[in-house]
Swiss-Prot record:
Belongs to the UbiA prenyltransferase family. It is an enzyme of class 2 (transferase). GO terms for molecular function: transferase activity, transferring alkyl or aryl (other than methyl) groups. This is Polyprenyl transferase dpfgC. CDD domains: PT_UbiA_COQ2. It comes from Gibberella zeae (strain ATCC MYA-4620 / CBS 123657 / FGSC 9075 / NRRL 31084 / PH-1). The chain crosses the membrane at residues 105-125, 146-166, 175-192, 199-219, 237-257, 273-293, 310-330. Its EC number is 2.5.1.-.
Length: 330
């Protein structure tokens, strides 16, 4: 089956062929659970211990149900929270709104799945460290409620699904060029927290910032990629990627500071180590260029735009706080 786009009349983009990734995943889980249970002869034991007897000595695993297990996988990929997934789209006005929304949905899905896989990889590499940090000790791998084998299977499924969606979104054009850079960065990210990386003045925020800024490129390619080269797409997205790169360094430096006490005990590498006791000054220096860049003295109207963005930020902050209060009270 094919679908026609408004990008170029008469040209077809391969459809996903009726495949529904969620249905496929449910089928995989069903077959996996039943096959494993049959291999171990079923039995009266319930939960993970019924078909993973070797893990019965771990209470978190032995007591879990199938529903709990699936829930742990979702938590492992942070699907129960917001994710730092960044996508962007650009194109002339001759492109239909329906096509843009279609590509947007595919791009968000691909990025969300890949981000989830990256979370699993990070937690697998850091599982021993996470177990010693107050904020992260309850993560599934750190507390032992999910095995490393299960985590790797889950991660692989997410990567495969993300790759499949990306192929459809990009009409199978330059897929590896879009995927490999962010995949390599995702693999390297947790190792940026190690002591050796600090010696080399490599901080995990550099690597993470790249992985969050890069999706701007496949995002634009989803709309304009059929009419421009990969090099041109990258060139057009470069200013935006640079902005997101530095913004993410600021954002994640502030975020990771939550773990400063435990991280310093464990000698975990992070960008805030540069600042020492002057972390607030560092954060101000990081964010100031982005804010100042919004004002152009040659364009007086930019002052109004800056004021408007500040107002929108205030409204957004109020709504976010209200939502958090509501969710907390609920």
């Amino acid at each position: 089956m094919s679908r026609q786009t408004d990008m170029d009349p008469g040209t077809y983009v391969p459809d996903i062929g009726g495949l529904r990734f969620w249905d496929m995943w449910k089928e995989v889980v069903f077959v996996f659970v039943n096959d494993t249970k049959q291999k171990h002869g079923g039995g009266s034991e319930t939960g993970a211990g019924a078909f993973f007897p070797q893990y019965s000595k771990y209470p978190a695993m032995a007591a879990r149900s199938k529903t709990k297990f699936l829930g742990e996988l979702l938590i492992l990929s942070r699907f129960h929270k917001y994710n730092p997934v960044f996508t962007t789209f650009a194109g002339d006005r001759t492109i239909s709104t329906a096509f843009v929304f279609q590509q947007t949905a595919l791009c968000v899905l691909a990025a969300y799945l890949f981000c989830g896989a990256g979370m699993v990889w990070n937690d697998w590499i850091d599982r021993d460290i996470d177990a010693k940090v107050a904020r992260t000790k309850h993560r599934p791998l750190a507390m032992g409620s999910v095995t490393t084998t299960e985590a790797m299977v889950w991660m692989t499924l997410q990567v495969i699904m993300s790759w499949g969606v990306l192929r459809v979104m990009l009409d199978n054009k330059d897929v590896l060029k879009h995927l490999i850079p962010v995949m390599v960065a995702s693999v390297l990210y947790p190792f940026g927290k190690r002591y050796l990386a600090r010696k080399l003045m490599i901080y995990p925020q550099y690597i993470l910032a790249f992985t969050i800024a890069w999706p701007a490129i496949p995002g634009r390619a989803a709309i304009c990629g059929r009419h421009e080269s990969f090099t041109e797409t990258t060139r057009q997205c470069l200013p935006l990627c640079i902005m997101v790169f530095f913004w993410t360094i600021y954002l994640n430096t502030a975020y990771s500071y939550q773990d400063v006490v435990d991280d310093r005990k464990l000698k975990v590498n992070s960008f805030y180590n540069i600042a020492g006791n002057h972390i607030h000054v560092l954060l101000v220096l990081l964010v100031s260029p982005i804010i100042l860049a919004q004002f152009d003295p040659k364009q007086p109207a930019s002052g109004g735009t800056l004021h408007k963005s500040n107002f929108i930020l205030g409204v957004w902050t109020i709504l976010a706080c209200a939502a958090e209060v509501f969710l907390t009270s609920a």
